[in-house]
């Protein structure tokens, strides 16, 4: 079995591995590693994490019997090898495409994916539930959560460790320690692992590690173990299987193992990538026309911080993605990467605000969900001046259900004292940043999407934008489109097309999602023209819903209004443009809906020839 690569596409399940010897397992590892590099070079994906767990995943499937034994992949981005070994190699050509193979574990995709993940630090709690259910039902199987050292900094993981150790039930926890999560890890837990990792690494005896952090919590600790030595990993897994009570195997791996550009990565660049050239390690990207939204926000933050020493920046383990590295270098004493700890980050920002500081809390929209109670209880309830940069707001595409930034408007809309905004271009982003740090009446959220910000070549502008004041881009006559952020361009194109047919459709930049521009809304409603709201977010509890509530509360009748947005469902992975088109969030969708509304109001005319 020295040439195993060609057989990868024929794998149906992991049972064949039981017949392989160590050399054959190592050959399998080499073939899988080559397959991963080739396939992700075309599709993109989480190549670094998966190259680091090739041998570990092979050892797990060799020692256990999936799906009877339950693997729970924390975060789940490192599950590609697991997918290959469970019969999905042939689908890797569709990885993260619309309708294709998911980049994370998916229960409907395979019986071997027993729990879906995407956010970090959830695996241990899920595993606790499974072992409790197993024992109540008097069943026999192993539960094996695989969690990284980065995810172990999350409070939820520590809560679960505390409970699992106290319960004393049989469970085998795999700690995949690669000294990185997305960015280099931080914190005391990271330091503890570092001491274990460097103390006679791979030669520790049980006697030498008595009293470790994990044993104090009630776990039997095995390690550190070389995660790229299949035989050593299997030996320790077999020992863990014979041990009663919770066991933690400390597996040391190298992120990006086997592909030099990924191995040498210290910034997290190779954590998740787009397509790349295998030979050179260079990324294949379309020509960049403008700065990213994250860069625009970060650069403005630096400019403001140069003038105001009260401004500090906080990120929960995303300094690279949120483009805060320059800020960290310029103001190291005012930059805080707290690790995967969104709840702590949010209340820490609240504490800073009580002392007159001006915290900028930057969190991806999908991860802001994790800090909801802290937003309500600690920030908004106390009306504290915290500026929240909601990065990756809207659809993010390939990462799918677990990462779409589509819920924040709905869950922030209901919180008193919260201001929510979203710029249409770079200049407006800078203006909203300036406005936010000049605002002294509570929390101020600025949403911005993934990708490039239009308007990069426009001159600097420091004009503050009055709270709740919208911008009329095209004066409405026959109908009006209310929208914000990236969908502004769709509305403008739709208005241009409709103008050619003789319809004068207004476009309003509703850059403040909360509060609404009530004065402008009254003015529009008095015109008695059709109103269309467009948003790249959930309709339930969204911007359009707020407009409807305003209309009802203001006792307007006979209003022709429609909302375009995302339905009440989790949105799967795929191209953002394809997803938007499928829900009518497109120029064509807007044009058709406006015509439908004009017909409903009796204002549709025959198309000009």
UniProtKB/Swiss-Prot annotation:
It catalyses: D-glyceraldehyde 3-phosphate + pyruvate + H(+) = 1-deoxy-D-xylulose 5-phosphate + CO2. Its cofactor is Mg(2+); thiamine diphosphate. GO terms for biological process: 1-deoxy-D-xylulose 5-phosphate biosynthetic process; isopentenyl diphosphate biosynthetic process, methylerythritol 4-phosphate pathway; terpenoid biosynthetic process; thiamine biosynthetic process. It is an enzyme of class 2 (transferase). The keyword Hydrolase does not apply. Pfam families: DXP_synthase_N, Transket_pyr, Transketolase_C. It comes from the Bacteria. Binds 1 Mg(2+) ion per subunit. Binds 1 thiamine pyrophosphate per subunit. GO terms for molecular function: 1-deoxy-D-xylulose-5-phosphate synthase activity; magnesium ion binding; thiamine pyrophosphate binding. Mg(2+) binds at residues 149, 178. Keywords: Isoprene biosynthesis, Magnesium, Metal-binding, Thiamine biosynthesis, Thiamine pyrophosphate, Transferase. One of its GO terms (cellular component) is cytosol. Coiled coil: none annotated. Pathway: Metabolic intermediate biosynthesis; 1-deoxy-D-xylulose 5-phosphate biosynthesis; 1-deoxy-D-xylulose 5-phosphate from D-glyceraldehyde 3-phosphate and pyruvate: step 1/1. Homodimer. Belongs to the transketolase family. DXPS subfamily. This is 1-deoxy-D-xylulose-5-phosphate synthase. It comes from Listeria monocytogenes serotype 4b (strain CLIP80459).
